[in-house]
Amino acid sequence: MLVAERQQKIVEIVNMRSSIRVSELSDIFSVTEETIRRDLEKLEKEHKLSRSHGGAVSIQQKESEIHFSEREITNVIEKKAIAHEAAKYVKSGDRIILDASTTAWYMAKILPDIELTVITNSMKAAIELSNKENISVISTGGILLEKSLSFAGPLAERSLETYHVNKTFLSCKGFDVHNGMSDSNEWQALLKKRMIERSDQTILMADSSKWGNREFSHIASLQDVSRLITDSGLDPASVKALEDKKVKVTAVPLSKRG
């Protein structure tokens, strides 16, 4: 990796994390701590970050990550209905990926205790699945994003290169026919792209409120999706537009269950 590229990545990491220690950056980039200190000194002079005792802090206010506790209470009925439908596509012996969405967490909660291998970047999903003795759980590791209680970044992306799975179950912040799937967080988008690449099938779990939204970071085309599971709030014209593009759509009816 070129010096300029490493320094750009350092800025991205610091902005994502708000703060980080020199030792962590040294591990991420496999260079000495002295090299990282020189990088931070240069970046501070360029007004791209601020050095602190033992590390660096962001000079930006970044709000692309919504706190998990807030997402957990948003569109709960829709997300639970979608999660229940998605769980039907999992069978014993599968190797699957779950992203760090609240819908994937709801899915983790209801997955039967059968022979499965689950790779996830979600702390919540990993903890939930750890209670099921027949399910093997692999965490991607990486940089912890405190608001979403998930891992992302270069280490998380590299960890996926080791694996191949049958199915990936993920969500997004926005999707439409022309622009595909998108996310407000660049690192989450990059990791989801890697998840799709490592999987035979990708099942998108997205409630109807996300239809038509176009967020900052592109994930992938809807042509990369094997099936979209959404809720019955998605209007028939939109369903037809998706099906015209050869996207298989399952729109689950909504009940009063919470």
Curated annotation (Swiss-Prot):
Keywords: DNA-binding, Repressor, Transcription, Transcription regulation. The keyword Transcription regulation applies. Residues 20-39 bind DNA. The keyword Transcription applies. Signal peptide: none annotated. Residues 3-58 form the HTH deoR-type domain. GO terms for biological process: regulation of DNA-templated transcription. One of its GO terms (molecular function) is cis-regulatory region sequence-specific DNA binding. It comes from the Bacteria. This is Uncharacterized HTH-type transcriptional regulator YulB. It comes from Bacillus subtilis (strain 168). The gene is yulB.
